[in-house]
């Protein structure tokens, strides 16, 4: 059966998209807007190979595989054993089982051993400094930078990114300034930025960034509303995600 003919069954133990299903009951971080935003937005050019750092359930990896029509290899790296097993199962049940490969590995070690170089790297990374413990060690690992500092992440991506490649992340708005300051100190350059708000009455709460290792001029900035004044999905959000949500 081809990717275009594949229609996922509706199930209650995960999230059903138009062309694949994501089970996430063994993953610390469930399917959410952050991952969907990054997977739908990350700019695609003439990609040769893609890396998803901290892939969790493989949501972003499969979204990118769909957008590339299975023509671009995707390596999905996940440290947590249970999540990596479930990610591999999600990939195996998808139309892109021959395109996406899940690696249970630490990205710092992976970046030192992989023979591949990537034209696009994406990550929905841990974002908070160590604080109140979460309900499980797995969720603490997924949310807090004690498991992977932003500096270590930036160094690891730098080691595997092609000179003309891009590194795309989604981050909470309150830490973007510190992240960009750190990135610039490590010779990264901002290429694209999208400030995301839930609706016109709410402040920006998430930011999508594309970074490069070569200066980009000009830097493009824009804004995205998820919902409009009537709490309906905005036209821009619909256009971004309509290939994935069943309801669009």
From Swiss-Prot:
Entry-linked Pfam families: MTS
Q: Record's superkingdom?
A: Bacteria
Matching entries from Gene3D superfamilies are given as: Vaccinia Virus protein VP39
Q: What InterPro entries does this protein's entry cite?
A: DNA_methylase_N6_adenine_CS, SAM-dependent_MTases_sf, Small_mtfrase_dom, tRNA_Adenine-N(6)_MTase, tRNA_adenine-N6_MeTrfase
Q: What is its EC number?
A: 2.1.1.223
PROSITE patterns per the record? N6_MTASE
| Keyword GTP-binding among UniProt keywords | no
- Give the residue range of the signal peptide: none
Q: Where in the cell is it found?
A: Cytoplasm
Give GO MF terms, alphabetically: nucleic acid binding; tRNA (adenine-N6)-methyltransferase activity
Q: Which reaction does it catalyse?
A: adenosine(37) in tRNA1(Val) + S-adenosyl-L-methionine = N(6)-methyladenosine(37) in tRNA1(Val) + S-adenosyl-L-homocysteine + H(+)
**Which GO CC annotations does the UniProt entry carry?**
cytoplasm
Which Gene Ontology BP annotations are present? methylation; tRNA processing
Keyword list (alphabetical) reads: Cytoplasm, Methyltransferase, S-adenosyl-L-methionine, Transferase, tRNA processing
Name the family: Belongs to the methyltransferase superfamily. tRNA (adenine-N(6)-)-methyltransferase family.
State the function annotated in the UniProt record.
Specifically methylates the adenine in position 37 of tRNA(1)(Val) (anticodon cmo5UAC).
Q: What is this protein called?
A: tRNA1(Val) (adenine(37)-N6)-methyltransferase
């Amino acid at each position: 059966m081809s990717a275009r003919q594949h229609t996922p069954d509706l199930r209650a133990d995960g999230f059903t998209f138009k062309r694949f299903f994501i089970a996430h009951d063994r993953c610390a971080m469930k399917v959410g807007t952050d991952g969907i935003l990054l997977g739908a937005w990350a700019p695609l050019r003439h990609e040769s190979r893609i890396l998803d750092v901290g892939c969790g359930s493989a949501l972003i990896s499969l979204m990118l595989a769909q957008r590339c029509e299975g023509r671009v290899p995707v390596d999905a790296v996940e440290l947590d054993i249970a999540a990596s097993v479930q990610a591999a199962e999600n990939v195996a049940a998808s139309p892109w089982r021959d395109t996406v490969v899940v690696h249970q590995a630490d990205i710092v070690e992976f970046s030192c051993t992989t023979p591949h170089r990537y034209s696009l790297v994406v990550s929905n990374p841990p974002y908070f400094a160590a604080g109140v413990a979460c309900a499980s060690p797995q969720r603490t690992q997924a949310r807090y930078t004690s498991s992977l500092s932003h500096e270590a992440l930036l160094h690891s991506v730098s080691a595997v990114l092609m000179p003309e490649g891009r590194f795309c992340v989604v981050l909470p708005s309150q830490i973007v300034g510190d992240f960009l300051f750190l990135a610039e100190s490590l010779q990264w350059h901002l290429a694209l930025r999208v400030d995301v708000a839930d609706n016109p009455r709410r402040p920006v709460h998430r930011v999508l960034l594309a970074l490069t290792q070569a200066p980009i001029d000009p830097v493009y900035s824009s804004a995205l509303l998820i919902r409009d004044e009537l709490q309906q999905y905005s036209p821009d959000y619909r256009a971004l995600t309509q290939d994935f949500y069943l309801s669009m």
